[in-house]
A protein has these predicted regions:
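Gly/Ser/Thr-enriched, mixed-charge loops and adjacent short helices
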Residues: 1-2, 15, 111-234
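An N-terminal, well-structured beta->alpha segment
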Residues: 1-70, 96, 146-177
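N-terminal small/polar loop signature for handling phosphorylated ligands or for N-terminal nucleophile
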Residues: 34, 38, 42-110, 162, ...
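Proline/glycine-rich low-complexity loops and linkers
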Residues: 78, 133-159, 253-326, 333-334
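Short beta-strand-to-turn element immediately C-terminal to the catalytic PLP-Schiff-base lysine
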Residues: 115-118, 250-254, 334-335
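Gly/Ser/Thr-rich active-site loops/lids in small-molecule metabolic enzymes
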Residues: 124, 203-205, 257-276, 343-352
Length: 473
């Protein structure tokens, strides 16, 4: 009996040799082929890329073969490739879609498949539903054998991101950066750009190592410890990191402190609105900082909130002009470039913001906290049985739950999980406290997110939230 294949917020992922098998890759590729044949212009072909994980090159070859056997021409990456490079090629070559073999920031023993729409971004929920519906087919479609062409997907992409940022200004200011590829498919890309432009950088974890020794390729603490140490030791002005497939960003300030994706989003948003004055609305996911709301309000920009997953942000980018959209996990995109998150581009734009403001990353973050009030954020991943996970969500939704620890629940929201807004101290103009409980649909996992006006309050809410989930509070 065939294993069930479940699509999450960004495609399909599974454990290598358990769920992620070459047979299942063929099934997913067959479903994608059927979708393209029925809904897109198959003669325009599909772009296929892959990251630096175990089995990624072979899995990408299998995807290419299934598509070609269905009569769909394929351009297959000739090397490990950032996900946004695949999306860029899809849009600018007019392809019918793109496939990226990756498990993004997951541990070393995972892999997966992402599908990119013909517009050059994360497939919308409607597209993903159509692909899922095709999984039930007994066999992949067959057609007149099409050509598989191996191509360099990085060259034109690198030109494009360099044109989008002011590389001359970055080079002129003489800031020094530490650059961490986390052994992912962004290895050599950002460091190559900096080297060509004469930007001083210190490179770490650029080599190929699919075991990701000691880390998950996710640019958050504790996985950025080596980057933090490097920034301090080498006296860098900032540390820049990309995840396993280089579509997400993480950063470190000059003192070695971690700068989360929320602060990165806010630094870039404020810079774009204050300096660049680009048009468009602002989009954030349900689990992101509400400092974004304050910045958008100051500059008179409309704010949209979406469910969690960049595909929902991309969906909105298809409907209207979006200056900037992002999610909690470090995915940030811009309509005027691509309706896609891009770790490499955001690293360049962060360096650009530092250069134009003449300030280190830590100084830019401090400016935010001063102007818009102290905002601190925390996340806790609880690997628990499904029964406990479901029970916690039911209790959170229950009308009888009117407090979290010693704090009264002022209101609840249910867009994606259950969010409590809490009667907790704001320390003047600081963040209004909230806690979000969200159960994973594909893993034995419940994530707890919280924001508050102090680090201490964030930690208190994480502890109290975990006690609530486990039934001890």
């Amino acid at each position: 009996m065939a294993q069930e294949i479940k699509f999450g917020t960004d495609g399909w992922r599974g454990l290598i040799a358990d769920d992620f098998t070459f047979d299942n890759v063929r099934r997913v590729a067959g479903a994608i082929a059927s979708y393209v044949l029925k809904n897109e212009r198959p003669q325009h072909g599909v772009i296929v890329g892959y990251d630096a994980r175990f089995a990624s090159p072979r899995a990408a070859q299998i995807v290419a073969e299934v598509l070609a056997e269905a009569g769909i021409p394929v351009k297959l990456a000739n090397d490990y490739t950032p996900t946004p490079a695949v999306s860029y090629a899809v849009k600018h070559q007019g392809a019918a879609g793109g496939v990226m073999v990756t498990s993004s920031h997951n541990p070393w023993n995972w892999n997966g498949v992402k599908f990119k729409g013909s517009f050059g971004g994360s497939a919308t929920p409607a597209i993903m539903k159509k692909i899922e519906d095709e999984l039930a087919a007994a066999a992949a479609p067959k057609g007149t054998q099409a050509k598989i062409e191996e191509v360099d997907l990085k060259k034109e992409y690198v030109k494009a991101v360099c044109a989008f940022a002011d590389m001359d200004l970055i080079a002129k200011t003489k800031f020094k950066f530490a650059v961490d590829a986390m052994y992912g498919s962004g290895r050599g890309v950002l460091t190559g750009i900096f080297a060509e432009r004469g930007v001083h950088c210190v490179a770490i974890r650029q080599e190929l190592n699919p075991l990701f020794p000691g880390i998950n390729p996710e640019p958050i603490e504790p996985h950025v410890a080596m980057l933090q140490e490097t920034v301090v030791r080498e006296k860098c002005d900032a540390g820049l990191a990309t995840d396993g497939d280089a579509d997400r960003i993480g950063a470190v300030a000059e003192d070695g402190s971690f700068v989360d994706s929320h602060k990165i989003f806010c630094v870039l948003l404020r810079w774009l609105l204050e300096r660049k004055k680009w048009p468009g609305d602002v989009v954030r996911a349900f689990n992101t900082t509400r400092m974004i709301d304050r910045i958008a309000a100051k500059y008179g920009r409309k704010l949209h909130e979406t469910s969690i997953g960049f595909k929902y942000v991309a969906d909105l980018m298809m409907e209207r002009e979006i200056l900037m959209g992002g999610e909690e996990s470090g995915g940030i995109g811009y309509s005027r470039f691509l309706p896609e998150r891009d770790g490499v581009l955001n690293c360049l734009l962060l360096a650009n913001a530092m250069a134009e403001e003449g300030k280190t990353l830590g100084q830019l973050v401090a400016d935010l906290q001063h102007e818009f009030g102290p905002h601190y954020y925390g996340r806790l991943d609880l690997h628990i049985p499904d029964e406990m996970k479901e029970n916690a969500i039911q209790r959170a939704r229950s009308e009888s739950t009117q407090s979290l620890g010693k704090y009264k629940v002022l209101k609840k929201e249910y867009m994606d999980g259950v969010k409590f807004f809490l009667d907790a101290p704001t320390n003047g103009n600081g963040a209004e406290a909230w806690a979000l409980f969200r159960a994973s649909g594909t893993e034995h996992l419940l994530r707890l997110y919280t924001e508050a006006s102090s680090k201490e309050l964030v930690q208190e809410l994480l502890v109290t939230g975990e006690q609530f989930v486990r039934g001890s509070a």
